[in-house]
Amino acid sequence: FIHKENKNPEAYATLSRYAALSRSMALFFRKIIKGICKKELPEGIKPFYLFEDKDGEPRKIHVVYSGGDDLFLVGAWDDLMGFAVDLKRVFSVYTNGKLTFSAGLGLYSSTYPISRMAEVTGELEELAKNSPGKNSIALFGSGTEYHRNEKNSSAAEKENAAVYTWDE
């Protein structure tokens, strides 16, 4: 949006530019999400699979929330991972690689409360945003009993978060 090394970035930070960026991001997330869930990607981008394609079936994903540049999904872990990789790739094409993309992905049992999933994955997203260069995804698995009982640990830290750049 504004080059980091610009000597006068305030000159470009106008209300109309922010409105255009906001509108473009809302359009992207409103229109593109459904297609990625169905594995319908722009020309030249093939869907990412951790395992082989399940006979062209749509991904087993439910959109709980999508607004602005935020998104909260639940579903099969391998489909969510494929979705995250595809969303990052399509987002990079859409923004010509000019914007970073941070995400948090958690693994939960089917009985885990969705409100708690949202809270912890939000913390994971913050870990990804706070990593050097931002352009990262925070993943996690079961934490140790020690970390779960530690009073000063965030929920994401208690669950043993691992942060990776999208290039790793």
Regions picked out by a protein language model, each given a short descriptive name:
Residues 1-168:
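Charged, helix-rich terminal subdomains or tails
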